[in-house]
Amino acid sequence: MSNNITSITRQLIADEIETSKISICGKLNDAEFLNRIFDLEQLPSQDKRYKTAFGDISCHSRFGDYETITWMFNDSRFNLLHCNDELFIRFICETLNPAVMHKQEDLDKLKAIYSRYLRGDGYELYIRYNISSMPIYGVRKIETGIDIQEKSIQQYLDSEYVLSKVNLMKSMVKTNTDLALGSAKELLEIVC
């Protein structure tokens, strides 16, 4: 799967979150948050005192050992700057999840940051559904005018539509030649 959300966009998102000082983990600690996306018990520790990433990250986040809020973007275990789009989108959506983010002000700031940069790569945030009257966000490809036009053309190329136009032309040839010719011209313009 190719990445449509570029590493430039991802870095811009990380940089603005860092500048804004928004805790992307919300009310969870770093390990609890990341464990919602990755199985930290299966990932290696970068500290020989711990067997797994969960213990490593729990300890280091508890004692404030990470220099930046967005350290996880540059951690090779998560590869957020270069992972596939599906994983990156999951990460973004978890930061907006009501089980994670409890401050409306931070939620609004994150939504604005994500929307601003994702739009450049042709994506947008949207509300997938609600739980307990709270939105669960998703990210989707923005349909451009060309995409919409393509769907419209595909509808006209549907064999049922073409057949209905051909039948109309056949039935009108003897009784209303102008209508038959107009239908033929319309069909040709749509197809070509």
Question: Can you say where each PLM-predicted feature lies in the sequence?
Answer:
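Short terminal alpha-helical segments
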Residues: 1-47
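Generic alpha-helical structural element
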Residues: 2, 22-26, 151, 158, ...
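Internal, Lys/Arg-enriched amphipathic helical interaction segments that engage polyanionic partners
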Residues: 39-164, 168-171
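Short, hydrophobic, well-ordered secondary-structure elements
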Residues: 166-170, 174-192
